[in-house]
Amino acid sequence: MRNVLITGTPRSGTTLICSLLNKLPDTVALHEPMNVWDFAECRDGGAVADLIENFCAETRTSLHEHGFAISKHVRGKIPDNVAADQVNRAGTRLRYTEHGPVSVDKPLSQNFTLVVKHPAAFSALLEVLSQRFECYAIIRNPLATLASWNSLAWFPLKD
């Protein structure tokens, strides 16, 4: 079984990567599905890796037995971008995400590829996680990343 972790700075393209990976056969990519605040209760990085492994195992079971996984989503789909095109009065874009079950209606083998992305949390733990998981960091031009942060209501850099 292949469990892949995606990391990178926020707004670097990790959500787009998940959306694209979900178009591949025998692959499911989840957008920030875990409660990363649970990581703080772990005694060390190895315990966090155990928590992630358990999450992956439970998610695989759920996908095979029930056809769904828990993930952030927009109207039941993992989007390519969580920032809305519309802007608010302040000129910043909003996000419309929910956290809950996402149906996966494609055939999955017993050894399908499961991808989990948590940019900030996995970046902080990359040294430990890369010893147990296949990890990929998404890199985007820093100016484009900062411009994206500046356009969002939930990333108030202007203050």
Give the positions of each predicted feature.
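Glycine-rich phosphate-binding P-loop
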Residues: I6-L21
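Active-site micro-motifs of SAM-dependent methyltransferase domains
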Residues: K23, N35, A144
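Post-Walker A helix-loop "phosphate-sensing" segment adjacent to the P-loop in P-loop NTPases
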Residues: K23-H31
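PAPS-dependent sulfation machinery
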Residues: L30-V115
